[in-house]
Design a protein with these regions (language model features):
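Long amphipathic alpha-helix in the N-terminal Rossmann-like dinucleotide-binding domain
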Residues: 47-48, 89-93, 100-101, 111-126, ...
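Rossmann-like NAD(P) dinucleotide-binding subdomain of oxidoreductase/dehydrogenase enzymes
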Residues: 166-323
Length: 553
């Protein structure tokens, strides 16, 4: 008998499965705030404000120890929110108990429970937006979209793909083999057996969007999860976990299928969990160094690490619109997106456009002007840049000075009229030569390198080598040469890097759409997993077949 919540959400699940196969645009969660209830913004803001300087309830029970150190990048003051601090072994013990029940919960029941939790989260999108804004530094609109509709899309995608994979084979059948004068009949069962307890490690810049794919993939496949958020960005994922636990409680299922494990910067606990023998699965977003350590633990590990994203600018229909697109992509959230471009490779002889040949200096001039026009715009500038999440981001960039190149645009003095104390920085633009090593490392945050190359072939060679050795989540190319376009596609795809060609207008390299785009390929050093393909799901469980002779039935 189907769970009532499965029946309630079956139509949506069916639509999501179809969308996965068709790869067309699909979302049950519109991304614009105006699509939601009038008054939702005020209610969400009020709900967020009420939680400031309080203990966050709803993510654990019976705990008296509380910690928290979140700071708003806009206010430059602490939020004062405290979260329950629990002993790791006790958390794992509770996860083990919950696993024994959850793994035996039917596939349909799991799907219904999980989709219902997303519908509950939907009612808190505005609160989530303010929580995200004041922990990550994203603008309000980006916070609303990334932690609300877009995160829900990714979670639903994981549920749908999980449901599909779990039903790949029949649950039970009678297998008959003709043997001449008689038939051999066996009863066979096929069980997707979950691996156990998963650890989902969040990041400080996208605390829900990057967390929910692994979390919901774990839960859908019968595993339980411990979520270890970044200590500076806890509240957004705490809201989601609260709703998940509420739905479980209402349906007489263990709330501890998902638990929040918090720590501080000075007293981290991630390694305690990661190295524990009961942790079987790890999902991680963050630096390559820590990601490499996690992968070395020899557990089932799904990583999104750092990479060096590049653009090759060989020719373009319109240089101005091209540079405007690049400037926005590099400025969005001050370059703190894993999909943001860092390097632009340009032939030293310039590029062809519909208006004729543009020399290298003209390309630089158009790019810097586009960047300056965007970030100094009184409305577009602050909303595009957002705020810097971590002080160290600016410290690391400032420490590099001119990066050994020629600075053609310094960081500009940008202010946000709504938040006078906001930590804001526009991208610095630096020109380098192709022989320099500087651009071959990731510099997280507001910096953009323009690399002067001998020709387009050297540019492509450098980009390919970078993707293969350092990893790349995105790659963008501008060319009017169809043969060269094909060559770029073949060369970059051979190192498992996707390419976005000739983006302009509202199409930006930063954006990956759920149900259509794969986020990270899993084939280069930027990460070993992809949101959301079959491999992202079916490594979380093992197919086990049992056989029964008729007289044992």
């Amino acid at each position: 008998m189907s769970h009532p919540l499965f029946k309630k959400h079956q139509a949506l699940l069916d639509q999501a499965i179809i969308a996965l196969k068709e790869r067309k645009f699909f979302t049950p969660y519109p991304e614009h705030p105006k699509a939601y209830e009038e008054g939702g913004n005020e209610e969400g803001k009020a709900s967020f404000s009420k939680k400031l300087n309080t203990n966050y309830l709803g993510v654990a029970e019976g705990n008296s120890d509380w910690i928290g150190e979140e700071i708003s990048p806009y206010w430059q003051t602490g939020l004062g929110i405290q979260y329950p601090k629990e002993n790791p072994q006790e958390v794992i013990n509770k996860a083990k108990s919950a696993f024994e029940i959850w793994k035996n919960t039917s596939i349909k029941s799991r799907a219904g429970i999980l989709i219902e939790s997303l519908e509950r989260v939907k009612s808190r999108f505005f609160e989530l937006a303010y929580a995200t804004m004041h922990t990550t530094g994203q603008s309000f609109l980006m916070s609303f979209q990334a932690s609300g509709p877009h995160a829900n899309d990714r979670a639903l995608e994981a549920i749908a793909k999980g449901y599909e994979e779990l039903l790949e084979y029949p649950e039970e059948l009678t297998w008959t083999k003709p043997m001449g004068k008689f038939d051999l009949a066996l009863k066979k069962t096929f069980k997707p057996v979950p691996k156990g307890i998963g650890l989902v490690i969040g990041c400080s810049t996208f605390p829900t969007w990057n967390t929910v794919p692994g979390l919901f993939a774990n839960l859908m496949t019968g595993n339980v999860s411990i979520v270890k958020p970044h200590p500076k960005a806890i509240m957004p994922i705490a809201i989601l976990i609260e709703e998940l636990r509420n739905v479980c409680k209402e349906n007489k299922l263990p709330e501890d299928i998902v638990q929040l494990a918090v720590d501080t910067v000075k007293e981290p606990i991630t390694k305690i969990y990661a190295e524990h023998s009961e942790i079987k699965l790890i999902d991680y977003t963050g630096s390559s160094s820590f990601g490499d350590y996690l992968e070395g633990l020899q557990k089932t590990c799904f990583t999104e690490k750092s990479g060096v994203n590049s653009i090759i600018l060989e020719s373009a229909q319109d240089l101005k619109s091209t540079c405007q697109n690049i400037a926005f992509s590099a400025s969005l959230y001050s370059g703190q997106m894993c999909t943001a471009p860092q390097n632009i490779f340009v032939p030293e002889t310039g590029i062809e456009t519909k208006e004729g040949k543009m020399n290298f200096e003209e390309v630089l001039s158009t790019l810097t002007q586009s960047m300056e026009n965007l970030v100094t715009h009184p409305k577009m500038g602050p909303g595009t840049l957002g705020a810097i999440q971590n002080d160290n981001t600016l410290v690391n960039i400032d420490a590099q000075g001119d990066f050994g190149g020629k600075v053609i645009l310094e960081q500009l003095n940008i202010s946000n009229p709504e938040f006078a104390s906001a930590r804001i920085a526009s991208p610095k633009i630096v020109v380098l030569n192709a022989t320099q090593a500087t651009y071959q490392e990731e510099f997280f945050g507001p910096v953009l390198f323009v690399i002067k190359c001998k020709n387009k072939l050297e540019a492509l060679q450098k980009i390919k080598e970078l993707a293969e050795s350092k990893g790349a989540i995105t790659c963008s190319a501008y060319t009017l040469d169809e043969a060269f376009e094909k060559k770029i596609e073949e060369e970059m795809n051979s190192v498992f890097t996707p390419v976005s060609f000739n983006f302009s207008g509202p199409a930006f390299i930063n954006q990956h759409a759920a149900f259509s785009d794969f986020h990270v390929t899993g084939g280069n050093p930027a990460g070993n997993a992809s949101f959301t393909n079959s491999n992202f799901i079916n490594r979380r469980f093992v197919w086990v077949g049992n056989r029964y002779m008729p007289n044992t039935l």
